[in-house]
């Protein structure tokens, strides 16, 4: 132990001679601090740990990896953060770990670095303590991305080697194997990759679950068993339009939920895509745990400065330690903190050199087989704003007057499904005393696909709103069958969904309505719904008007206008 410690300290002095004033603790101190504070390693604290790896930031240690008595422990090198960051029930070397696990280590190092720099405080990094019951790891599989998993993946032109499955496909496949679902898929897809057209008719694809092994060891599985898992992996990859490569295949995590619902018969009404930066740490852990408990394994994804990685969260110990299956043949699978910091207050569009899974981390929850006709389940994407709601509070408004443009940083649909044609978007006014809700909305004439968005929104104060104090939020909902029939204000609070805003950004306002004057004040909280529309006289030719009835010759992109096309009159976003 002393020899290891001397080697580490000498190497740091050579790299960073001015580090004497830096805040860090030695490997020996870090190990004993962790052993004293964590009952998870109580039985091992008298053993002789081996320092496997040290990760530094700016030449100063941030965390240590120890192997001891057949276990691995990730331990903080700073006494201002939780002592134990993660642990696994077997030892491993950094030479063998997955890129996803390596990126998680970098995340922890970045967050510890922010504490040292003063941009995060100790109380933000306390180990979580909650009443969640333990959930043993749900996935028995220890799958990877190479043979036999990629045995039917495409071969890039001019190469003899098959492309890797991709971490997205491996994560999807392991969750689907847990459910042993579906027996056959539905729908079909074609897309271009590397000057080739990749196609699959999922309705003719059957999945041979009984012949898929939990662990594949070379020379210990049959051809039938190898093909069974390889075909599943290929179907998952094609379903998310995988960009295949022999150096590493990739796909957008935002497409996972859509593929599961559209091609693999998972319950569309349960699937949700969540972004980490829009929720507190408590909210995030509660949603992940709730899905684990009620639906099964969750797919997590994180963006680091080295790219994105998808992996499976399939269990829970306690105090915030979730079981992670990294999709690397079982290597480094274990219990880890999802994060030790709440999301950065600067939001997604903020500046700075932020890196790690706490930045642009996301999750696909509610992965459960459809128990009925999946085509009839509700199916709508989630809108995320990349910045604040940003309503001008320096002026007063009147009912019918347009507020905006706001949300100039953009609002995007991150799935799992496209927003249908005529999806409604409006400012929802909810009376804080009576609960009455008013909303005037526009519609998306062409819908909004996954990964598409808009900015510079302008929307009116609802007509007919009564005096009182209201909460104002930006809300949307699926098209309503009777939307064109309403020509009078009506209270209708069904089906409205929140547009999500990053933690730390203004997401809502307080509006005081008195004798027809609306005063808006900055006051963040979350939303609810209603609607009201009014129609202008029909015209025989397509024309555009603003919400005050003045004709517009050249509407601006993102502007809410009234379109008259023959006898049809509706509000739309250009």
How would you describe each model-predicted region?
Residues 18-19, 527-574:
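C-terminal outer-membrane/trafficking sorting elements
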Residues 23-59, 73-74, 79-141, 293, ...:
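Cys-His-centered catalytic/binding microenvironment captured across papain-like cysteine peptidases
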Residues 47-69, 258, 262-325, 333:
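Active-site-adjacent substructure of cysteine-protease-like catalytic cores
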Residues 81-249:
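Active-site-adjacent structural segments surrounding the nucleophilic cysteine of cysteine proteases
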Residues 361-387, 523-550:
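Residue-level detector of functionally pivotal "anchor" positions at catalytic/ligand-binding pockets or at interdomain
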Residues 445-460:
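Aromatic sugar-binding surface patches on proteins
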Residues 460-469, 554-557:
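Surface-exposed, short loops/turns at beta-strand junctions within beta-sandwich domains
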Residues 480-527:
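Short beta-strand elements
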